[in-house]
Swiss-Prot record:
The chain crosses the membrane at residues 4-21. It is found in: Cell inner membrane. One of its GO terms (biological process) is FtsZ-dependent cytokinesis. Residues 22-94 are periplasmic. Essential cell division protein. May link together the upstream cell division proteins, which are predominantly cytoplasmic, with the downstream cell division proteins, which are predominantly periplasmic. Its main location: membrane. This is Cell division protein FtsB. It is a single-pass type II membrane protein. Signal peptide: none annotated. Pfam families: DivIC (PF04977). Residues 33-76 form a coiled coil. The keyword Coiled coil applies. The lineage of its organism: Bacteria, Pseudomonadati, Pseudomonadota, Gammaproteobacteria, Vibrionales. Belongs to the FtsB family.
Length: 94
């Protein structure tokens, strides 16, 4: 009977060890959960960025205001009859 109890005890210890630290155990499960949370946050940020890009694309396709704004800001274009003034700060002069 003592051998049987000892065998069952050793089996229980081995099963608990395997459950906690073995392959696909609790520790692996927690590590994978943490990776999933990080990846979900990255995906949410990328989804938000994609939505902003789609909105900008739609605005460029449908409205001339967005095209005009980009031409003014990025290319420095002005309309006929307008005068462009560039204000130079103190840091830029030196």
């Amino acid at each position: 009977m003592r051998v049987f109890a000892l065998t069952l005890s050793l089996l229980l210890v081995w099963l608990l060890y395997t459950l906690m630290w073995g392959k696909n155990g609790v520790m692996d499960f927690r590590a994978v959960q943490a990776e999933i949370e990080v990846q979900q946050q990255v995906n949410a940020n990328l989804h938000l960025r994609n939505q902003e890009m789609f909105a900008e694309i739609d605005d460029l396709r449908q409205g001339l205001d967005a095209i005009e704004e980009r031409a003014r800001n990025e290319l420095g274009m002005v309309k006929d009859g307008e005068t462009f003034y560039r204000i130079i700060g103190e840091e830029s002069r030196q």
